[in-house]
């Protein structure tokens, strides 16, 4: 018996091929129908043959196994644990666990000179009483190959070796599998669902609105149509973005006085505003309720994409670095999506690149402050049309 196993091992070490034979001496791929296994050399000649029902000196789960199990294990040496386990289930053969299978394959191929499962005295393999504990209910619990394979690998770690047991007593579990995958910082991604829903609704509404427009019509100001939610529900305050540059004509320091009191004051003569944010409220003739605007000179608080949907106007100085942290860095794309304004003093030339942008040029007089009323009235009238195009009523 041991000689048959040793002879088979020598053939496998030499690279000989295994061929299964049935009772009639014909080749077969089904090991359950085979009765013999033959070894073929590289030139195709038969070297040796072995009965598959012969009991070997390999002990698995406390009992000696037939050569059929060893051959089946070898023929599936390149199969995954899941595929091998499924094949054992289909053919009703003893399942050799992953660690046991690895040990046997290494011994049969000659990679190792011993196997802890070889029980015959005097053989090159170790005489060992170590028995790996396998899950006896794997066959009935094969709801999925994946879960059963996981259970098999888990049980392989339960050994009765006193050295291993003693070593495991001194182990400290720093992190388990689930904790490593979960991470240490809990993050709630629920807001992404709301953002996705908002984007989806806006996309659908935009498509419906665009389909009702006459051919060739692009909407107000020839820009890409954007909505800000359902016209029947409550709306969040619209946002006006202004430059943060100290050289800008309008800053958070003087914007409120300019838009509400129609009076321009040089921002250098006014104290700075903390946080770069001011709020103003404005009544419009064609909108039924007062609109409260948030005016900011930066996008640090734009933590969600929906904030950009609320931007109804952008003031620019003509410097492209102003748009570095914007959702759209290109002025051409930015002002196709958002209403743009370029405020400048009368007599100052408008840069050539600004003239190519889709922005409204608004002129201020340097000295005649009584003209500020007309300028502010023009701005609010322009912005009112923008709000109405976005669904404000």
UniProtKB/Swiss-Prot annotation:
Pfam families on file: CDC73_C
Lineage top rank: taxon: Eukaryota
Gene Ontology MF terms in the entry: chromatin binding; RNA polymerase II C-terminal domain phosphoserine binding; RNA polymerase II complex binding
BP term (GO), one: transcription elongation by RNA polymerase II
Keywords on record: Activator, Nucleus, Phosphoprotein, Transcription, Transcription regulation
Region (Disordered): 210-235
Quaternary structure (record): Component of the PAF1 complex which consists of at least CDC73, CTR9, LEO1, PAF1 and RTF1. Interacts with FACT subunits POB3 and SPT16.
Protein name (database record): Cell division control protein 73
């Amino acid at each position: 018996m041991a000689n048959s196993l040793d002879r088979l091992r020598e053939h496998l070490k030499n690279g000989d091929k295994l061929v299964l034979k049935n009772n009639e001496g014909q080749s077969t791929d089904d090991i359950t129908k085979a009765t013999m296994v033959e070894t073929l050399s590289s030139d195709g000649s038969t070297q040796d043959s072995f009965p598959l029902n012969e009991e070997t000196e390999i002990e698995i789960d406390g009992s000696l196994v037939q050569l059929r199990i060893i051959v089946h294990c070898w023929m599936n040496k390149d199969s995954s644990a899941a595929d091998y386990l499924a094949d054992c289930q289909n053919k009703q053969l003893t399942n050799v666990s992953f660690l046991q299978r690895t040990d046997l394959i290494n011994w049969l191929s000659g990679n190792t000179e011993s196997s802890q499962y070889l029980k015959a005295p005097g053989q090159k393999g170790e005489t060992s009483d170590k028995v790996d504990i396998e899950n006896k209910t794997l066959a009935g619990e094969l709801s999925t190959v994946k879960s059963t394979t996981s259970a098999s690998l888990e049980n392989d770690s339960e050994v009765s070796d006193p050295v291993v047991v003693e070593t495991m007593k001194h182990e400290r579990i720093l992190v388990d599998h689930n904790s490593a995958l979960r991470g240490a910082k809990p993050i709630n991604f629920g807001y992404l669902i709301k953002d996705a829903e908002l984007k989806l609704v806006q996309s659908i509404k935009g498509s419906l609105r665009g389909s009702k427009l006459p051919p060739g019509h692009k909407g107000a100001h020839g820009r890409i149509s954007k909505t800000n939610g359902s016209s029947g529900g409550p709306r969040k305050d619209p946002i006006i973005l202004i430059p943060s540059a100290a050289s800008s004509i309008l800053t958070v320091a003087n914007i409120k006085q300019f838009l509400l009191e129609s009076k321009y004051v040089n921002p250098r003569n006014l104290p700075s505003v903390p946080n770069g944010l001011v709020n103003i409220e404005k009544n419009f003739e064609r909108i039924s309720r007062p609109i409260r605007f948030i005016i900011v000179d930066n996008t640090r608080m734009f933590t969600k994409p929906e904030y950009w949907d609320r931007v109804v106007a952008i003031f620019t100085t003509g410097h492209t670095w102003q748009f570095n942290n914007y959702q759209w860095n290109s002025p051409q794309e930015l002002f196709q999506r958002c209403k743009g304004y370029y405020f400048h003093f009368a007599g100052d030339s408008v840069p050539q690149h600004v003239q190519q942008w889709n922005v409204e040029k608004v002129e201020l007089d340097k000295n005649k402050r009584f003209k500020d009323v007309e300028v502010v009235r023009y701005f609010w009238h322009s912005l009112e049309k923008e709000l109405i195009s976005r669904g404000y009523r």
